[in-house]
């Protein structure tokens, strides 16, 4: 449509791949991340700001101090690490007051990637050990709140306002959740089965193995480690694996 937009990715590799794919599809696109030279970053940024390129694909290194009021969409190709980052980046859409769109994609590996960044963050290397521990716990909690945002069925604007301490009980009517009718489903049986399975494993196995057990998998890992003797083995065999993954999240 010719609209200007920003696509945020977690890693340089994702930026390169998304930019490559869009360019092959004929889109006017450029990129921005810390792995590029200062000269290329500056050139790409100016090409986007002055309309020579329609789409900017970037890591969170892009955006500070950028004044481009006609950004019509902001897409998060990956979930950011906290609500603060998301709010700031999504807020770059529609600064001219015209209708704009923000889209957030999520998959479980985004949580793992962000957790890895938090665990191995070099920006806190100058802090003492006790302070680093406090900062890491804070960042992990913020990551949890960001993940909750991806799964909530409440008004997304309301969630953001409440997160930042501005209590709101009204619905915006614009977000996907406000425009979607949700059906409540009782998953007590599934949840309790998964919890009992984890207890029997002393919580020593990951999600994929737990799902394999309760679904009745016969992989070499399951049979070789006698995990088919778990009391919850195959209890949820009639559920689909994607559904069990969704519940376990």
Where are the regions that the model predicts?
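Short helix-to-turn junction characteristic of helix-turn-helix DNA-binding domains
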Residues: 48, 150, 198-202
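C-terminal accessory regions
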Residues: 139-167
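Accessory DNA-binding and partner-docking regions appended to nucleic-acid-acting proteins
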Residues: 113, 124-128, 138-139, 156-158, ...
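Short glycine-enriched loops at secondary-structure junctions
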Residues: 13, 108, 160, 216-217
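Conserved phosphate/pyrophosphate-binding and hydrolysis machinery centered on Walker-type P-loop NTPases
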Residues: 8-12, 34, 38, 132-136, ...
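Helicase motor core with emphasis on the C-terminal RecA-like subdomain
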Residues: 1-130, 141, 166-170, 177
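Short Gly/charged-rich anion-binding patches and loops
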Residues: 17, 43, 145, 209, ...
């Amino acid at each position: 449509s010719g609209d200007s937009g920003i696509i945020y990715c977690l890693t340089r590799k994702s930026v390169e791949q998304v930019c490559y794919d869009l360019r092959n599809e004929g889109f006017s696109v450029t990129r921005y991340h810390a792995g590029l030279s200062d000269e290329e970053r500056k050139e790409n940024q100016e090409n986007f700001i002055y309309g020579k390129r329609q789409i900017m694909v970037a890591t969170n290194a892009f955006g500070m101090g950028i004044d481009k009021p006609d950004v019509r969409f902001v897409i998060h190709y990956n979930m950011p690490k906290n609500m603060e980052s998301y709010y700031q980046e999504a807020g770059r859409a529609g600064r001219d007051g015209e209708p704009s769109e923000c889209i957030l994609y999520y998959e479980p590996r985004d949580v793992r990637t962000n957790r890895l960044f938090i665990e191995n963050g070099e920006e806190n290397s100058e802090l003492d050990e006790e302070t680093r521990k406090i900062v890491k716990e804070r960042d992990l909690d913020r990551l949890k709140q960001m993940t909750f945002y991806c799964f909530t069925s409440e008004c997304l604007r309301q969630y953001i306002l409440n997160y930042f301490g501005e209590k709101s009980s009204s619905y915006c009517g614009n977000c996907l959740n406000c425009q979607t009718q949700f059906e409540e489903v009782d998953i007590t049986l599934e949840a309790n089965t998964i919890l009992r399975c984890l207890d029997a494993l002393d919580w020593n196995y990951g999600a994929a193995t737990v799902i394999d057990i309760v679904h009745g998998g016969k992989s070499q890992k399951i049979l070789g480690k006698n995990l088919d003797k778990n009391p919850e083995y195959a209890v949820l065999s009639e559920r689909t694996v994607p559904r069990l993954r969704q519940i376990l999240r």
